[in-house]
Amino acid sequence: MAPSELNCTHQNQHSSGYDGPRSRVTVVGSGNWGSVAAKLIATNTLKLPSFHDEVRMWVFEETLPSGEKLTDVINQTNENVKYLPGIKLGRNVVADPDLENAVKDANMLVFVTPHQFMEGICKRLEGKIQEGAQALSLIKGMEVKMEGPCMISSLISDLLGINCCVLMGANIANEIAVEKFSEATVGFRENRDIAEKWVQLFSTPYFMVSAVEDVEGVELCGTLKNIVAIAAGFVDGLEMGNNTKAAIMRIGLREMKAFSKLLFPSVKDTTFFESCGVADLITTCLGGRNRKVAEAFAKNGGKRSFDDLEAEMLRGQKLQGVSTAKEVYEVLGHRGWLELFPLFSTVHEISTGRLPPSAIVEYSEQKTIFSW
């Protein structure tokens, strides 16, 4: 669908009587969650007079088995046939394989790609985005640098020179795609007006979004829970039962909170009770892709690598938990914290073959007595 076909634009915006500036939104990423995000946003830009109707979605171009380009198929069918089959994205979503072209007119940028690609994407966009643009990261993960861990929102802010909020929550994408009720949390820093604009852009009757002034807390919840989900998958693969899984989730939540507050003392306790915290942890440990692949890893006795299982089971989607466990392990080792975080440490050591999957319950929590 070409932008010129969006005949609804003028009708909606002129009939509203709104004369102020209109924001343009681009979604950078088009996987499972990126496609669902575009669908949510596209529903609201049609209704909200302060937004242009069209939503651009940058697609990392792929050739489908049919020989067709993924971008062409999305624009012809209004459906991401590879990463979100069977779901219409909205007639105002336009897929674009050219990253710079996709973002050039946007003043609201939504980033939703695997976290390991973000530094490269940001470097490609340096000097190419509108002055005063706002960013929102839906990305779960961190970059580990010599000077310490760098959250993805900070990476975006530092490289692009723009403010970046985050959105995290108990959000299994396929359930939101079919409009099952769920919640999410926007984390912001100081500017509540911008946060409320993001809340407005994502909120629907089936997707409830709230905002909290705690970017690091919200983002770390979304990042660290994937490590705990890997542990939960090991428990499932070894058929250890619900009591064991509940214990692993509790210990994991405790380590999530402790790690977050050691890195960023400003992180708020209440953030862990938002959708981005305990709710996201529960849903990811019950139904997410990290749990699913970790279960298969444990059933195979750790004899098949996560890379092999990911390629076989996820149809091009990427795991986040294994790479995040590695990144967190590096931080723990560098700061001398390994013994303080036995669950996080053990997940990485199992994932890399240093320990068997059964080791997930073979450590002591005695040294994890934190004051918070």
UniProtKB/Swiss-Prot annotation:
Keywords: NAD, Oxidoreductase
This protein's name: Glycerol-3-phosphate dehydrogenase [NAD(+)]
Record-listed E.C. numbers: 1.1.1.8
GO BP term, pick one: glycerol-3-phosphate catabolic process
Domain of life: Eukaryota
Active-site residues annotated for this sequence: K225
EC main group: oxidoreductase
Similarity-based family: Belongs to the NAD-dependent glycerol-3-phosphate dehydrogenase family.
GO MF terms, alphabetically ordered: glycerol-3-phosphate dehydrogenase (NAD+) activity; NAD binding; protein homodimerization activity
InterPro entries found in the cross-reference section: 6-PGluconate_DH-like_C_sf, 6PGD_dom2, G3P_DH_NAD-dep, G3P_DH_NAD-dep_C, G3P_DH_NAD-dep_euk, G3P_DH_NAD-dep_N, NAD(P)-bd_dom_sf
List of residues binding NAD(+): G29, S30, G31, N32, W33, G34, F60, F117, K140, A173, R289, K318, Q320
Gene symbol of the encoding locus: GPDH
Binding-site positions, substrate: K140, R289, N290
GO cellular component: cytosol
Record-annotated membrane-spanning stretches: none
Segments of skewed composition (Polar residues): 1-16
PROSITE patterns the record matches: NAD_G3PDH
Organism encoding this protein: Cuphea lanceolata (Cigar flower)
Region (Disordered): 1-23
Reaction(s) catalysed (UniProt annotation): sn-glycerol 3-phosphate + NAD(+) = dihydroxyacetone phosphate + NADH + H(+)
